[in-house]
């Protein structure tokens, strides 16, 4: 089975903004065709191939459904894979802002200030949404994979910061 990218599997143009309803419809349409239950009485080989396709489709669907995974897939497709462990392309200014925010979260937790925690959480979520819009523009309008990758790393950083609220 030749390696296919998630966009090819669903017949979608490789771009960041996707129609979620169209993706869902395609997923169920394709899944019906290759679901292993349809091949229960088939040969072992056919059953194994159906299982492989079902797994491939599920993995592709998960990648395309999650904006970070979709962005990482686009970066890889465009020759700019993202190393999650590296913050090298994130600006020092952004990192300093996040350090200050992390301290504010810690202070609010220590003092039991739930109102301040909620304000901080909403600010992170808003910044994340704005960055995802910037990622979409970088990929789909500007075709600037480096900018998209930098913004995507920022989103990943903010996601980790949101874990501080759990």
Regions found by a protein language model. Name each.
Residues 1-166:
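C-terminal accessory/regulatory regions appended to core domains
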């Amino acid at each position: 089975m030749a390696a296919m990218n998630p966009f090819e599997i669903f017949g979608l143009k490789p771009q960041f903004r996707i129609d979620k309803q169209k993706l869902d419809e395609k997923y169920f349409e394709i899944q019906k065709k290759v679901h292993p239950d349809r091949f229960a009485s088939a040969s072992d080989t056919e059953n194994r191939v159906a299982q492989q396709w079902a797994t491939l489709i599920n993995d592709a669907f998960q990648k395309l459904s999650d904006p970070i995974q979709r962005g990482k897939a686009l970066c890889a497709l465009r020759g700019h894979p993202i190393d999650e462990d590296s913050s090298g392309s994130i600006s020092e200014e952004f990192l300093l802002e996040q350090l200050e925010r992390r301290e504010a979260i810690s202070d609010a937790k220590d003092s039991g200030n739930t109102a301040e925690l909620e304000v901080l959480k909403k600010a992170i979520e808003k910044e994340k949404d704005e960055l995802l819009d910037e990622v979409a523009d970088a990929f789909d309008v500007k075709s600037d994979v480096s900018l998209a990758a930098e913004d995507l790393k920022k989103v990943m950083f903010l996601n980790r910061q949101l874990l501080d609220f759990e």
